[in-house]
Curated annotation (Swiss-Prot):
InterPro entries: Chorismate_synth, Chorismate_synth_AroC_sf, Chorismate_synthase_CS
Biological pathway: Metabolic intermediate biosynthesis; chorismate biosynthesis; chorismate from D-erythrose 4-phosphate and phosphoenolpyruvate: step 7/7
Pfam families recorded: Chorismate_synt
Protein name from the UniProt record: Chorismate synthase
Oligomeric and partner information: Homotetramer.
Job of this protein: This reaction introduces a second double bond into the aromatic ring system.
Family statement: Belongs to the chorismate synthase family.
Cofactor(s) the record lists: FMNH2
Binding site for NADP(+): R47, R53
Cellular component GO terms, alphabetical: cytosol
Organism for this UniProt entry: Acaryochloris marina (strain MBIC 11017)
Length: 364
């Protein structure tokens, strides 16, 4: 399994949905980064289940335990281990899934690859694995903010067909956190909540789009050819459970424009800094950040595990039906926001360290 991510700032996540716990080991974190357990807990609380009626009813406090790598509120430069223990496990809810495959879930492919799987809550394929990513992302955010003033903010842009008009240059964390669906447009947020409520009552699920902006990103992050910044961001974000699409800047809509319409023209601002008039490139050109805001979007499919009867097969290939039990999100989007933020922060933090190591080692 590919459980490790990153180059200089590396994370390895561990644990299963209904095992003893989940967590992360972070290697390559610089020393003397100021971070409190409360900073990590804040991000985990945004991700945790049971926080509202439109998320899974599983009740977990997701309390983080910092096992190593920190002392007196600062990082030591040694491996950081963060553990979150599972409390509200109900493996009996998944007993039927020991033999029967959930449509569009990882059950069948895990069996095909490994010949064995933890069917209790999906095991390693569960979104509970992302706890380690979000915890590591909290530290990456601190490094980015303290070293370069970078701010990473995600929000729900669309739920099924309900879409919000949001300015990524102006959106604030307070606006995002002002409602349970994490859409900074209050009117659209209410429409989204009503749609998720209706879907939940129908024992079904829906998907949507998370948009994320990284502001004040320094120029020069990323590298040709295979380590282009947008390629690294795409891999990171699409490694999240249920993520089925990724675009940056103008994305697929840019294919409808001509070069003259799409190109971001340059100018020099009043401080002498070279800027672009528009930002259809999404803050990245030639795989390298250009100093403009990085704007990306991630598409998340409807949750695979639903309560409606579906045709499927068991491990023997025999036809059957499954109406899944257990506790599941009718829509993953509200809880996916901190996950997307975390993966973006991890990539930017890793590339910030790599840029300093390669290009600024001998500069004054």
């Amino acid at each position: 399994m590919g459980n490790t991510f990153g180059h200089l700032f590396r994370i390895t996540t561990f644990g299963e949905s209904h095992g003893g716990g989940v967590g992360v080991v972070i290697d390559g974190c610089p020393p003397q980064i100021e971070i409190a357990a409360e900073d990590i807990q804040f991000e985990l609380d945004r991700r945790r289940p049971g926080q509202s009626r439109i998320t899974t009813p599983r009740k977990e406090t997701d309390t983080c335990e910092i096992v190593s790598g920190m002392f007196q509120g600062k990082t030591l430069g040694t491996p950081i281990t963060i553990l979150v223990r599972n409390k509200d496990t109900r493996p009996q809810d998944y007993s039927e899934m020991a033999q029967v495959y959930r449509p569009s879930h990882a059950d069948a492919t895990y069996d095909a690859k490994y010949g064995i799987r933890n069917w209790q809550g999906g095991g390693r394929s569960s979104a509970r694995e992302t706890i380690g990513r979000v915890a590591a992302g909290a530290i990456a955010k601190k490094i980015l903010q303290q070293a370069a003033g970078v701010e990473v903010i995600g929000y729900v842009k669309r739920i099924k067909t309900v879409e919000a008009d949001i300015d990524p240059d102006q959106v604030t964390l307070a606006q995002v956190e002002a409602n349970m669906v994490r859409c900074p447009n209050p009117e659209t947020a209410e429409e989204m909540i009503d749609l998720i409520d209706q879907t939940r009552r129908d024992a079904n699920s829906i998907g949507g789009v998370v948009e994320c902006v990284a502001r004040q990103v320094p120029k020069g992050l990323g590298a040709p050819v295979f380590d282009k910044l947008e390629a690294e961001l795409a891999k990171a974000v699409m490694s999240l459970p249920a993520c089925k699409g990724f675009e940056i800047g103008s994305g697929f809509a840019g294919t409808q424009l001509t070069g003259l319409e799409h190109n971001d023209e340059f100018y020099t601002d009043e401080t002498g800094r070279i800027r672009t008039v528009t930002n259809r490139s999404g803050g990245i050109q030639g795989g390298i950040s250009n100093g403009e805001n990085i704007v990306l979007r991630a598409a998340f499919k409807p949750t695979a595990t639903i309560g409606k009867p579906q045709k499927t097969v068991n491990q023997a290939g025999e036809a059957t039906t499954l109406a899944a039990k257990g506790r599941h999100d009718p829509c993953v989007l509200p809880r996916a926001v901190p996950m997307v933020e975390a993966m973006v922060a991890l990539v930017l933090c890793d590339h910030l360290l790599r840029h300093h190591a390669q290009c600024e080692l001998l500069t004054e």
